[in-house]
Amino acid sequence: MKTALILGGTQFFGKRLVHKLLEDGVIVTVATRGRTRDDFGDGVERLVIDREKKESMTRAFEGRQWDTVYDQSCFSPLEAKTAYEALEGKIGHYIFTSTMAVYEFGKERKETDFDPLLFDPTFKHRKEYGGMTGYQEAKRGAEAYLFQNAKVPVAVVRPALVIGTDDYTERFLFHVDKVKKEEPIGAKNDDVSFSFTSSEDAAGFLFHAGKERLTGAYNIAFEDNFSLRELIGRIESAADKPAVITGEVTKENASPYGLPGDWTLDVTKAQMTGYSFGNMNEYVESLIEKLL
C-alpha cells in the first residue's frame, strides 16, 4: 500500500489512522466536507466532497488512482453506492468502517452472525434512518452493497464501543463526570455486558487491514468485556466516591451505555490475521485516571 484515500478521517480514530499511514510512508489523501480542522499539516492532500452528492465525488476523484480507500464516513447504502461508483476503476482495495450494531444483541457475536451477502439494502438518504434500528439497517445495507457489488477486494471492520481520550462523543467521560460530581446515572439494567475497543486498536486494525490486504468482515474489541455496573465500580474505586445509579432514567442522567441486552464480540478471526489487541483492564484503568 503506497497510496490511500480516506473518506472522512478528521475525527476520533480516523485521525489516528491517518497518522499511522503517514508514519509508514503512505501518501495520503483526505476527502471531507472541509469543515473540521485537523493536525496533519502539509503531510496530506485534502479534497472537499459531499458524501450525499455523487457528482461532488466524481469531480474530486477524476483522473486519480489510489491503492486503498478507507471509508470512515459512510452512513447509508446509498452513500456506499455513490462512493464506490465514483471510485470504480480508481482503487484496488475498499476498507469500510462498519459497527458491531450490525448484530442483534447477544454474547460473543461472530462475523458470521450477520451475512451481508444475504441482506437486501434499501437506498435512502442517511437522515431517513432514525434511531438505533435505523443505524443498524443503514450500516448493514452499506456492507451488503459493497460485498455484493464491488469489483475490488472489500474488508469491513466492525468495532465495538470505541473509547479513548480522543472520543469526541464523550460517552465514557459521561460516567466519569457523573461519579466525580456524585450525580445520578440512569440505567434500567446495569448488569448487561458489552465489548469495548480502544481508539488505538480501531486505527491499528484498520491500518493492519490495508497493509495485509485483508478481505471479509472482522470484529474489533478487547478480548475481555464487562457490564455497566463493573465499569462504574472501577470509576468509583479510582475516584474514591460512591456512584448514584437509578432506574429512573431521564434525558439528563441516561447512560450512553444503558443497553437493553448483552452486546459482546468474538475477535478470534481478527487475531488469526496476526493482530494483537490491547489489554482491556490496563487501558480502562489508565483512561479513567486521565479523565478524572
Describe each model-derived feature in a short phrase.
Residues 176-186, 191-225:
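Alpha-helical substrate-binding/gating segment
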Residues 143-166:
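Conserved beta-loop-beta element that borders a ligand/cofactor-binding pocket
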Residues 82-138, 155:
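Conserved Rossmann-fold NAD(P)-dependent oxidoreductase catalytic core, especially the SDR/UDP-sugar
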Residues 4-24:
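N-terminal Rossmann NAD(P)H-binding glycine-rich loop of SDR-like oxidoreductase domains
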Residues 35-40, 45-90, 96, 102-103:
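NAD(P)H-binding glycine-rich loop region in Rossmannoid oxidoreductase-like domains
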Residues 260-292:
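C-terminal amphipathic/interface module of NAD(P)-dependent oxidoreductases
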Residues 7, 164, 187-192, 218-226, ...:
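Glycine-rich Rossmann NAD(P)(H)-binding loop
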Residues 205, 209-260:
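Mid/C-terminal beta-alpha module of Rossmann-like enzyme folds, strongest
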